[in-house]
């Protein structure tokens, strides 16, 4: 469930998806891990350059299960949900950058690929 939307009046560069501590985080598409480790504000993150050229960031992870340079497939477990960094509770912070590096709405990006998710009311 989306608990914080893209932009949301405070320049939020992604969406927050609430889940339980330790729940699996999976890659949304095939690609190469370009960074996996600590990152200011995110606690632990994984960044993947997907085969379409977009870069996805998966943040506030409790544990990372992949390393930079590793090839991943859609659906592969890459991390677990956590609340590290600037976080108010267990969730996945998910960002998408297009090929030019501009942040784009991850919920719309997922919906365009047949994976719609819902926002909390």
Question: Where on the chain are the PLM-derived regions?
Answer:
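Catalytic cores of peptidoglycan-degrading enzymes
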Residues: 1-121
């Amino acid at each position: 469930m989306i608990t914080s939307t893209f932009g949301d009046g405070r320049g939020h560069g992604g969406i927050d998806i609430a889940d339980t501590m330790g729940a699996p985080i999976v890659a949304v598409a095939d690609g190469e891990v370009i960074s996996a480790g600590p990152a200011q504000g995110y606690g632990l993150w994984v960044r993947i350059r997907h085969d379409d050229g977009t870069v996805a960031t998966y943040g506030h992870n409790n544990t990372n299960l992949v390393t930079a340079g590793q090839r991943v497939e859609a659906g592969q477990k890459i991390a677990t949900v956590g609340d590290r960094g600037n976080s108010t509770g267990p969730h996945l912070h998910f960002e998408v950058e297009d090929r030019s590096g501009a942040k784009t709405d991850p919920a719309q990006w997922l919906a365009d690929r047949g994976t719609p998710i819902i926002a909390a009311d």
